[in-house]
A protein has these predicted regions:
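Classical eukaryotic N-terminal signal peptides for Sec-dependent ER targeting/secretion
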Residues: 1-15, 19
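Metal-dependent phosphoesterase/phosphodiesterase active-site architecture
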Residues: 19-94, 154-230, 283-440
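Active-site neighborhood of phospho(di)ester-bond hydrolases with catalytic His/Asp-centered motifs
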Residues: 29-31, 90-97, 128-137, 235-239, ...
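Active-site environment of divalent metal-dependent phosphoester hydrolases
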Residues: 36-39, 100-103, 134-145, 201-203, ...
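Long, well-ordered early-domain segments
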Residues: 71-136
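Metal-dependent catalytic neighborhoods of phosphoester/phosphodiester hydrolases
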Residues: 96-121, 141-159, 246-251, 286-292
Length: 440
């Protein structure tokens, strides 16, 4: 009987299916650690951390402050929680931004590399046998945002730092321009594609007016074509996401031209791309990419940050978060996402970190899985008047930082339009429908 089941399992795996009751595959997503090595408790709250830029740290404690980037103790607590969570994961994705938010003169190339090295060694010490797929963030360079289109000291340094995780082909393209792809060990026909979307980021002056910086679009198309031919599935990871900012009107996370190109490519290869995973925003958000006819074809997940930092002018921020995805090991369909968080106020009061489950996406929202159709149906529920589902979503957007937070009509329209519309034409139409506004 066991032999027959094993044979059936093997046959189903070849067909991209899994046996009922087979354990789900799992991977962790961590992002935006933003270590501030200067963080320390002192009576002068303007001097607690360089990342507060002289502002008074509001309530500094052992695990940090909302006006500061992450102290090392907070980052250690996150990885310690993951290590002792009891969740057996086959890999981790780490989507960038290790250095703190400080003025350019306070850092250097050496300082940036040192912080990335520190975080790399920290991860390796907690998880010596875990496969990790890293990607670079806009702060993982000096000066920040200015990631180049050719070999650089930082690209070389991270390739050396990440040798234990990446194969020679991946390291070669990483050295050239900060992107790579690699198959996932133990997961037949699953490939990670790590994009350097910092090349498309508005503040990056290096790539201004370039149609295909570092030939990354050409490389991405070739990589996805090859995966299609080889019947692979792809998990796409990057730092800066595609789509529109959910708290702004008509602003894309990357330059609009690059966003349109990326969206077109991701539509064309939606049968290959089984999921997209981003950081950068420090908030917890979803997006659903639809094809030209409005059919949902791709699920996107923006993970909240480990750092709790906010700008002195902002009212809200995020509690620190890390997340775990579950997937079908046969066809790489995403089954669920478990978001974990640390209540920073509580941790500082008690002097100990108690990371806990914030929510399971399927259980909280009553959806069957994380496929595009499921998330599209959920987004439709969000859009209904007085949606209790959306109230939950908006609280989770800030990782349960402030349950009294209210999203008014315009705020909600911007959120809904950003979740469901990733290209200019559909986003503009959504704003027109909800707010009577059209954007260029």
């Amino acid at each position: 009987m066991a032999q027959a089941r094993a044979l059936l399992g093997y046959l189903l795996l070849g067909l991209g299916l899994a046996l009922p009751g087979d354990p789900a595959g799992r991977f962790w997503h961590v992002t935006d650690l933003h270590l501030d090595p200067t963080y320390h408790i002192t009576d002068d709250h303007t001097k607690v951390c360089n990342s507060s830029k002289g502002a008074n740290a509001s309530n500094p404690g052992p695990f940090g402050d909302v006006l500061c980037d992450a102290p090392y103790r907070l980052i250690l607590s996150a990885f310690d929680f993951i290590k002792n969570s009891g969740q057996e994961a086959s890999f981790m994705i780490w989507t960038g931004d290790s250095p703190p938010h400080v003025p350019v003169p306070e850092l250097s190339t050496d300082a940036v590399v040192k912080v990335i090295a520190n975080m790399t060694v920290t991860i390796q010490s907690f998880f010596p046998n875990l496969q990790v797929f890293p990607t670079l963030g806009n702060h993982d360079y000096w000066p920040q945002d200015q990631l180049p289109i050719a070999t650089s000291q930082v690209y070389d340094a991270v390739a050396d730092l990440w040798k234990a995780w990446l194969d020679e082909e991946a390291l070669s393209t990483l050295r050239k321009a900060g992107f790579y792809s690699q198959k996932v060990p133990g997961n037949p026909n699953l490939r990670i594609v790590s994009l350097n979307t910092n090349l498309y980021y508005g503040p990056n002056a290096v790539t201004l007016n370039q149609t295909d910086p570092a030939h990354q679009f050409e490389w991405l198309e070739n990589t996805l074509t090859s995966s299609q031919q080889n019947k692979e599935k792809v998990f796409l990871i990057a730092h800066v996401p595609v789509g529109y900012l959910p708290q702004s009107t008509g602003i894309t996370a990357v330059r609009q031209y690059y966003n349109e190109r990326l969206v077109a490519l991701l539509r064309r290869y939606s049968a290959v791309v089984a999921g997209q995973f981003y950081g950068h925003m420090h908030r917890d958000s979803l997006m659903v990419l639809s094809d030209g006819e409005g059919r949902p074809v791709s699920s996107l997940f923006v993970s909240p940050a480990v750092t709790p930092v906010r700008n002195v002018l902002e009212k809200e921020t995020n509690n620190p978060g890390v997340r775990l995805f579950q997937y079908n090991p046969g066809d790489y369909t995403l089954l669920d996402m478990l978001q974990y968080y640390l209540n920073l106020t509580e941790a500082n009061l008690k002097g100990e970190s108690n990371w806990k489950l914030e929510y399971s996406l399927t259980q909280t929202y009553g959806v069957g899985d994380l496929r595009p159709q499921s998330l599209y149906g959920l987004a439709k529920q969000f859009a209904t008047p007085d949606s209790k589902q959306f109230v939950k979503y908006y609280n989770y957007f800030f990782v349960s930082y402030d349950s009294s937070v209210v999203c008014d009509e315009k705020c909600k329209a911007l959120q809904i339009c950003a979740i469901m519309n990733l290209d200019r034409a559909s986003y503009s139409g959504c704003l027109q429908q909800h707010l009577g506004e059209r954007r260029p």
